[in-house]
């Protein structure tokens, strides 16, 4: 579905941000969670994938190279985010008629059908919609021209739990036919824990790893117990340990640490814990620790 090879983008301006040598492959039918701290380069990467920023390297979407076959590539990309790209002052029906002309395979009947399915009034002006309703309207439009790659930038930020549940269900439905893929950039890692198949972790403009979520998280264990017990864990197994007054918590390499002590409790890290301890273990530079443990 999506192949990115040696993508490189140098931004102008005071910060001169550099998106450096990004390569990964997201197969059809899968969801990727894009994570990293603010300023890591997530939005810049998404804008390169959208074609909003020109970059060197190759971006191939459903067989179409974004640099050499941009028109065909854009036909299969859907951008769903906080701001949107639609005229705020027209209603949803007119929105479909106007913007649908830009896509060869746009189907107005499908679009109206999705509006009905998402409980959206076709006569409602776009600017009158809530953030959650705007996301549904954008999805309805994208599904109506046959988009294959869906790019979401912080789609559930600031939204209530009910909409988040609805959104996660929609995402799993989107990829269920095996023909579509999704990249979600989000700080709400508990959402990604539930639906992401892959994790892409960025830091300072570099993609430090792109791994299947279960494999990445399953490579480690979070261990909690009395301070003196945790200190007995072999040093070569410890990625990072946080010591408290009476108890400590550490992330350890699963294959290098077999625990039999009942005073030590363990669980598989979630995405938030994984990133937290990788960063801490790398002394605020996760690149070293990632290369050490993931190769």
Segments from the language model and where they lie:
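ABC-family P-loop ATPase nucleotide-binding domains
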Residues: 75, 81-138
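Catalytic Walker B motif of ABC-type/P-loop ATPase nucleotide-binding domains
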Residues: 150-154
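Helix-to-loop junction immediately C-terminal to a conserved catalytic motif
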Residues: 50
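Conserved ABC transporter NBD signature motif
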Residues: 57-68, 72-73
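The feature captures the beta-strand-to-loop junction immediately N-terminal to the Walker
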Residues: 35-37
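Short loop immediately C-terminal to the Walker-B catalytic DE motif
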Residues: 156-157, 189
């Amino acid at each position: 579905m999506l192949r990115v090879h040696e993508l490189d983008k140098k931004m102008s301006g005071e910060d001169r941000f550099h998106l450096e040598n990004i390569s990964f492959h997201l197969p059809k039918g899968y969801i990727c969670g894009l994570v990293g701290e603010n300023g890591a380069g997530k939005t810049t990467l998404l804008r390169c994938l959208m074609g909003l920023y020109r970059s060197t390297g190759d971006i191939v979407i459903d067989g179409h190279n974004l640099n050499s076959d941009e028109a065909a590539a854009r036909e299969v990309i859907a951008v769903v985010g906080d701001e949107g790209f639609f005229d705020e002052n027209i209603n949803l029906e007119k929105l479909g008629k106007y913007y649908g002309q830009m896509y060869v395979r746009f189907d107005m009947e499908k679009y109206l059908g999705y509006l009905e399915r998402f409980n959206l009034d076709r006569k409602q002006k776009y600017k009158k919609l809530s953030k959650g309703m705007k996301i549904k309207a954008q999805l309805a439009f994208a599904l109506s021209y046959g988009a294959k790659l869906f790019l979401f930038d912080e789609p559930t930020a600031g939204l209530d739990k009910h909409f988040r549940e609805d959104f996660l269900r929609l995402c799993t439905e989107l990829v269920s036919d095996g023909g579509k893929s999704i990249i979600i950039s989000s700080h709400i890692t508990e959402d990604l824990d539930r639906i992401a198949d892959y994790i892409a972790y960025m830091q300072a403009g570099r993609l430090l790893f792109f791994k299947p979520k279960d494999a990445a998280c399953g490579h480690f264990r979070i261990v909690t117990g009395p301070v003196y017990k945790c200190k007995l864990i072999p040093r070569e197994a410890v990625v990072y340990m946080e010591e408290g007054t009476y108890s400590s918590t550490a992330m350890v390499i699963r294959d290098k640490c077999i625990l039999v002590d009942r005073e030590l409790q363990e669980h598989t890290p979630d995405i938030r814990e994984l990133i937290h301890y990788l960063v801490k273990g790398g002394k605020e530079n996760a690149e070293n620790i990632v290369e050490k443990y993931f190769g």
